[in-house]
């Protein structure tokens, strides 16, 4: 049998994930194939927050589901650290290692709970991936408290908790695996404003802990708040990859999209239209309304 040749790993020391010419077609063997990902290529740096945006059906969730092997590519290559995922593979080697490296927090993760205690639910992933029950139990307590729930919750039945508490338990279970890459798919769906703020803080904390984070979202104010890089998808194609300000201030590009600007950016554009001195705000790059107010005061003070 002819041995299949694995491509050379292209990743450099500061890179964690590379995608080369990835394509995905659903219903490929029918008369109505649907191309969901169209020749996507990008190399992702370590310890960055990447926000993936685009219209519904643009391929965002399908893309990230390739990263941890949930969907097999029809064409192209993916490297997650030293783990290779390719279209010609029958199965992924080191699949358990891949699961330890990259985890997805799906939309409404609370619906994934199934054990009779919170502790067992959080322990499930780490134990399944080879950790001892002792270590998993310690991590269950640690990550549950990180999510704002105290030790007594470990013995509670997850189905007796509120919706917000269930979501915290589900996320604690994923954090307990301690993956290097975290993917959040619409993490603020169904949350109140306080819950949104807590989720954004969790994502910032993940970066502070040297993790690489992906976030799929339609909430542009959250993109501005946390993203290092924004990737814009349209009909399965990568049409732009840049910083939030480079994306949101590119009027020529925006005119071709349905992106709704975050309030901070809209205010900046309105102020620039009144007085060119406010172009200074683009350099200061405020990420939220509080920072914007401070930046406006600073700009006014400097220009009288």
Swiss-Prot record:
Name the domain of life this protein comes from.
Bacteria
Q: Which GO terms describe its cellular component?
A: ATP-binding cassette (ABC) transporter complex
Kindly list the GO molecular function terms attached to this UniProt entry: ATP binding; ATP hydrolysis activity; ATPase-coupled transmembrane transporter activity
Q: Which Pfam families match?
A: ABC_tran (PF00005)
InterPro entries hit by this protein = AAA+_ATPase, ABC_transporter-like_ATP-bd, ABC_transporter-like_CS, ABC_transpr_CbiO/EcfA_su, ECF_ABC_transporter_ATP-bd, EcfA2, P-loop_NTPase
- Reported EC number(s) for this entry are 7.-.-.-
Q: Where is the ABC transporter domain?
A: 11-260
Give the top-level enzyme category. Answer: translocase
- What does the UniProt entry say about where the protein is found? Cell membrane
Question: What is known about what this protein does?
Answer: ATP-binding (A) component of a common energy-coupling factor (ECF) ABC-transporter complex. Unlike classic ABC transporters this ECF transporter provides the energy necessary to transport a number of different substrates.
Q: What PANTHER family has UniProt attached to this entry?
A: ENERGY-COUPLING FACTOR TRANSPORTER ATP-BINDING PROTEIN ECFA2 (PTHR43553:SF27), HEAVY METAL TRANSPORTER (PTHR43553)
Under what name is this protein listed? Energy-coupling factor transporter ATP-binding protein EcfA2
Q: Look up and give the organism this protein is from.
A: Mycoplasma genitalium (strain ATCC 33530 / DSM 19775 / NCTC 10195 / G37)
């Amino acid at each position: 049998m002819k041995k299949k040749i694995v491509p050379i790993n292209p990743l450099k020391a500061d890179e964690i994930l590379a995608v080369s010419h990835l394509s995905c077609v659903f219903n490929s063997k029918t008369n109505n194939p649907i191309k969901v990902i169209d020749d996507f290529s990008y190399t992702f740096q370590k310890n960055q927050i990447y926000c993936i945006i685009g219209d519904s059906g643009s391929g965002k969730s399908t893309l990230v589901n390739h990263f941890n092997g949930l969907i097999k590519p029809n064409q192209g290559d993916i490297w997650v650290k030293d783990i290779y995922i390719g279209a010609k593979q029958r199965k992924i080697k080191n699949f358990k290692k891949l699961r330890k490296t990259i985890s997805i927090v799906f939309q409404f993760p609370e619906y994934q709970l199934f054990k009779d205690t919170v502790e067992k639910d959080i322990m499930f992933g780490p134990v399944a991936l080879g950790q001892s029950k002792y270590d998993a139990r310690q991590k269950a307590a640690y990550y549950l408290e990180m999510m704002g729930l105290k030790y007594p919750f470990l013995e509670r039945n997850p189905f007796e908790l509120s919706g917000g508490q269930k979501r915290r338990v589900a996320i604690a279970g994923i954090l307990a695996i301690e993956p290097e890459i975290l993917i959040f798919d619409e993490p603020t769906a169904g949350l109140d404003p306080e819950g949104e703020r807590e989720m954004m803080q969790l994502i910032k904390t993940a970066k502070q802990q040297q993790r690489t984070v992906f976030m799929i979202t339609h909430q542009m104010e959250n993109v501005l708040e946390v993203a290092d890089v924004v990737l814009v998808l349209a009909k399965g194609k990568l049409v732009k990859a840049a910083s939030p300000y480079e994306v949101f201030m590119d009027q020529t590009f925006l005119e071709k999209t349905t992106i709704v600007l975050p309030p901070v950016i809209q205010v900046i554009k309105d102020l620039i239209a009144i007085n060119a001195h406010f172009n200074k705000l683009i350099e200061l790059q405020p990420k939220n309304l509080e920072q914007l107010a401070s930046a406006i005061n600073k700009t006014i003070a400097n220009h009288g």
